[in-house]
UniProtKB/Swiss-Prot annotation:
Subcellular location(s) per record: Cytoplasm
Stretches assigned to the Lon proteolytic domain: 592-773
Active site, per annotation: S679, K722
Major subcellular location class: cytoplasm
Protein name: Lon protease
Subunit text: Homohexamer. Organized in a ring with a central cavity.
Name of a matching Pfam family: Lon_C
Organism: Rickettsia felis (strain ATCC VR-1525 / URRWXCal2)
Biological role: ATP-dependent serine protease that mediates the selective degradation of mutant and abnormal proteins as well as certain short-lived regulatory proteins. Required for cellular homeostasis and for survival from DNA damage and developmental changes induced by stress. Degrades polypeptides processively to yield small peptide fragments that are 5 to 10 amino acids long. Binds to DNA in a double-stranded, site-specific manner.
Upregulating conditions: By heat shock.
Domain Lon N-terminal: 6-207
GO biological process, one term: protein quality control for misfolded or incompletely synthesized proteins
Record-linked PROSITE patterns: LON_N, LON_PROTEOLYTIC, LON_SER
Length: 778
């Protein structure tokens, strides 16, 4: 197309799009000069002018370099002269053009070339996009109420013409609420698809902003109306209260309560000070509500209130034996604790902490202690507590502040000397809000807890009469907290103990819970043993109780569904008719002695477990690889076991060439369960020796113990739990460190009778008992 030349006018507050009719007020001298230089076109007898946005909007006299090159060829429809040498023109944007050779001092003039839009190939897609844009524009116009209804009507007419997509895009673009730079960028874009996409994006943003603004205005309006309404009601209430003199009556009750309670001197002074402050306040103010809540909380605490507990250790022992089977050493220590309390009204000894796997009766023991002492029982669950304000309370300055849970529990039981269970004390954690374990130090320390200060109360409260007893699954407690406690370890139950607990406690409890009559259902000992062996795998009896409950419900359902059934007897022969198939295998996992596979013993938070350790050798560089989600300590045990093996390889009839070209892969199933701890050295060493010498390991032998590089066996913890696991797993022989022999006195006699327990002091003795034949060649 041949280039043409026309006068050029700079705009600083608008961008005009093709097909749009727009008014322009002309006041700058250069713009007036450009307008005066326009001439009538020979083609249609009309005047034309070029208009473009200047780059700097605050520039009064922009140079030619400060003008955008993409402009509009506009047809002048009307010129109206105004006072003060200004004018108003009405233009119709004809086409988008590219400017070149801009010149002129008094007025701009430029050559131009019309810029065509890219051709639309995908008409259906464009129609869909344009429809979407028009719908969004209609929604925006309705919400914003700034767009003339005639504009919407014009667009709706244009949409009916499927070939006029470009005009619709231009009309929509001209009414967008966006920056001038964004509109100029939209004008410069030649792709219709990119332009309509930008229009849709901007309209969506405008709608969101408009809706947000309307919602905010509505919320502010409602808040203002509510505030005015509340003020009116409060003034009315205040007038009524003034007439009835209710305020004086309420404050008089608070004053009477302060005088009647056995408050400490500090607490009484604080209460009187707050009451005095409350009298001088506007009763409808926020501050009076805070002060009133504080006084109510302060006066609701059990100041000087104590249960008349008379400890009788014989009666307490009967209660413990009634509620718990076995646990003789634990009950003996509790009775000793109560004996000291019976003789001394205040105890300065350590806090008891019951540590054991889930379901062994830790919580119920604390309830029995409270009953045996004749005191109320309360529980503070510490599992998942991260905020020290849960212990010490929130300061009054915070909105909705309350005292800590310690004082909250005392307020609940209405006594200052309950038995308080601090449950799951090992499950606390810390974050940016503080360390609750450190906050507990003041609560549990007998030298400090008589002067405990809650952040909310801001006065001392005596906690020295509260009996705190903690429970935990793991002995891994913060050092400072651990030093203030006496740990009592509760091991898991053996099979015989579980049987007795089920017969004497769990079955009657479930029958009572489900309203089972005595002659309706009977559960034999063989059925209970099958439940223990094949449906549960735990140190406690929690899962066993659930299975008995499920068994009871299914039997009850059968009785109620079939009126002819009067009695159901459950034994091992029909157990699976009521429950699902057996969940666990009872006995040995391996049917034959295996090479490179050893049974170890592990101690976890849920009790003892059998730990299978297996290994394979394959060509490599003499390295060792471990898998099974092992911790750092266990990985180091594997390295130590391998080094010990290599140092003794010649004793096993192996030459250096037998293992230097082989890598060993040690795996401990199951791979998803984390494993760590210093007690797997013997099992790791035995696995490696069995693998390299091709001598099987006795499948009936399990072992525990760490080893040194010189082959000495070191002592371990959790012996009782490990032996219980060995007994449950069908193990016949257990190898334990020689230094752990002293711990056998705590093992139940039936466990010691069911297992051959052999003490070992070095790895030669381990191999002698673990392997099918001795590999050592003297």
């Amino acid at each position: 197309m041949n280039k043409k030349s026309l006068p050029l006018m700079a705009l600083r507050d608008m961008v005009v799009f093709p097909g749009v009719i727009a008014p322009i007020f002309v006041g700058r001298q250069k713009s007036l000069q450009a307008l005066s230089h326009t001439t009538v076109s020979e083609e249609d007898n009309s005047k034309y002018i070029l208009v473009t946005l200047q780059k700097k909007f605050d520039q009064e006299n922009p140079s030619k370099h400060e003008l955008n090159n993409t402009a509009i060829l506009a047809k002048i429809i009307q010129i109206v002269k105004l006072p003060n040498n200004t004018a108003k023109i009405l233009i119709e944007a004809v086409a988008r053009v590219k400017l070149s050779n801009i010149k002129g001092n008094d007025a701009f003039e430029a050559n131009y070339e019309i810029i065509p839009d890219e051709e639309i190939f995908d008409v259906n897609n464009m129609r869909s996009l344009v429809d979407n844009a028009v719908q969004l524009f209609s929604k925006y116009a309705i919400n914003d109420k700034k767009v003339n209804a005639e504009i919407i009507e014009t667009i709706n007419k244009e949409i009916s013409n499927s070939t006029n997509f470009i005009n619709i895009i231009n009309i929509l673009a001209s009414h967008l609420i966006t920056s001038l730079e964004a509109k100029q960028h939209l004008l410069e874009e030649t792709s219709p698809f990119k332009r309509i996409t930008t229009v849709i994006s901007t309209l969506t943003s405008n709608i969101v902003n408009s809706e947000t603004e309307q919602a905010l205005q509505q919320r502010v309006r409602k808040q203002i109306e509510k505030t005015q309404r509340d003020y009116y009601l409060h003034e009315q209430m205040k007038a009524i209260q003034k007439e009835l003199d209710e305020d004086k009556s309420e404050l008089a009750d608070i004053e009477k309560k302060i005088k009647s309670l056995k408050l400490s001197k500090e607490a009484k002074e604080k209460a009187e000070s707050e009451l005095k402050k409350l009298r001088s306040m506007n009763q409808m103010s926020a501050e009076s509500g805070v002060t009133r809540n504080y006084l109510e909380t302060l006066l609701s605490l059990p100041w000087g209130k104590y249960d008349n507990s008379k400890i009788d250790i014989n009666q307490a022992e009967k209660i413990l034996n009634r509620d718990h089977f076995g646990l003789e050493k634990v009950k003996e220590r509790i009775i000793e604790y109560l004996a000291v309390l019976q003789r001394s009204s205040k105890i300065r000894g350590p806090i008891l902490c019951l540590i054991g796997p889930p379901g062994v009766g830790k919580t119920s023991l604390v309830k029995s202690i409270a009953e045996g002492m004749g005191r109320k029982y309360t529980k503070f669950a510490l599992g998942g507590v991260r905020d020290e304000a849960e212990i010490r309370g929130h300061r009054k300055t915070y909105l909705g502040s309350t005292p800590g849970k310690i004082l909250g529990q005392l307020k609940k039981v209405k006594t200052s000397n309950p038995v308080m269970l601090l449950d799951e004390i090992d499950k606390m954690s810390s974050d940016f809000r503080g360390d609750p374990a450190s906050a507990l130090l003041e609560v549990l320390d007998p030298e400090q807890n008589s002067h405990f200060v809650d952040h909310y109360l801001e006065v001392e409260y005596d906690l020295s009469n509260v009996i705190f007893i903690a429970t935990a699954n793991s002995h891994d407690l913060p050092r400072a907290l651990s030093d203030r406690m006496e740990k009592i370890y509760i091991s898991g139950y053996v099979e015989e103990e579980k049987l007795q607990i089920a017969k004497n406690y769990l079955v009657p409890k479930q029958f009572k819970m489900h309203k089972i009559k005595k002659d309706e259902i009977t559960i034999s000992e063989t059925a209970i043993l099958d439940l223990i062996r094949y449906y549960t795998k735990e140190s406690g009896v929690r899962a066993l109780e659930r299975e008995i409950g499920a068994l009871t419900r299914k039997a009850l359902k059968q009785i109620l569904a079939d009126k002819t059934v009067k009695h159901i007897a459950i034994d091992s022969s029909n157990l699976e008719e009521f429950l699902e198939a057996k969940k666990y295998n009872f006995g040995l996992a391996e049917k034959e002695d295996q090479i490179g596979s050893t049974t170890g013993l592990a101690y976890t938070e849920v009790g003892g477990e059998l730990l299978t350790i297996e290994a394979l050798a394959f060509p490599g560089k003499g390295e060792i690889k471990t898998t099974g989600k092992l911790g750092d300590v266990m990985k180091e045990s594997a390295m130590a076991a391998y080094s010990c093996f290599r140092s003794r390889a010649t004793n096993f009839g192996l030459k250096y060439d037998n293992y230097k070209d082989f890598d060993i892969h040690i795996h401990v199933p199951a791979g998803a369960i984390p494993k760590d701890g210093p007690s797997a050295g013997c099992a790791l060493f035995t696995t490696i020796v069995s693998l390299m010498t091709k001598i099987p390991v006795h499948r009936t032998v399990a072992m525990t113990g760490e080893i040194t590089l010189r082959g000495n066996v070191l002592p371990i913890g959790g012996l009782k739990e490990k032996l219980l696991a060995a007994s449950r797993g069908g193990i016949k022989t257990v190898l334990i460190p020689e230094e752990n022999v002293k711990d056998l006195k705590d093992i139940p006699p039936n466990i010691k009778e069911s297992l051959e327990i052999i003490s070992v002091s070095n790895i030669d003795q381990v191999l002698k008992h673990a392997l099918v034949e001795t590999p050592i060649n003297k």
